[in-house]
Amino acid sequence: MGYKILIVDDAAFMSMMIKDILTKNGFEVVGEAADGAQAVALYQELQPDLVTMDITMPEKDGITALKEIKAVNPSAKIIMCSAMGQQAMVIDAIQAGARDFIVKPFQADRVIEAINKVLS
């Protein structure tokens, strides 16, 4: 059985790209959220094995959502995804509990490598 993954990104194109990479590699995408508030609600409902989380989103950003999910489940596995390879953002995300960080545009092998590392 494949691992269940929740994709969080406000850009439909990015969600679609990640979903395509994941499904081709045997992962099951159980949900997609377009903002941080939706991400927290779906995480609690779906209990995925892993979350890919964009940082810059409307309503609630990815780092705030990351902190809220970690408050609900301290062992939650979350990988941050962002076009901003800004050092401060990466440090904030890791300090808040993110397990890894992927910079857009994604390379399929890097996405899979990060997910396998976090799930192992």
Q: Where in this protein do the model-derived segments appear?
A:
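Two-component/phosphorelay signaling modules centered on CheY-like receiver
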Residues: 12-31
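Acidic catalytic/metal-coordinating carboxylates
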Residues: 35-38, 61-64
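Active-site beta3 strand of CheY-like receiver
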Residues: 46-52
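Receiver (REC) domain active-site loop signature in two-component systems and cognate sites
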Residues: 57
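Short, conserved "switch-loop" micro-motifs in signal-transduction and mechanochemical regulators
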Residues: 84-85
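C-terminal output helix
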Residues: 88, 106-115
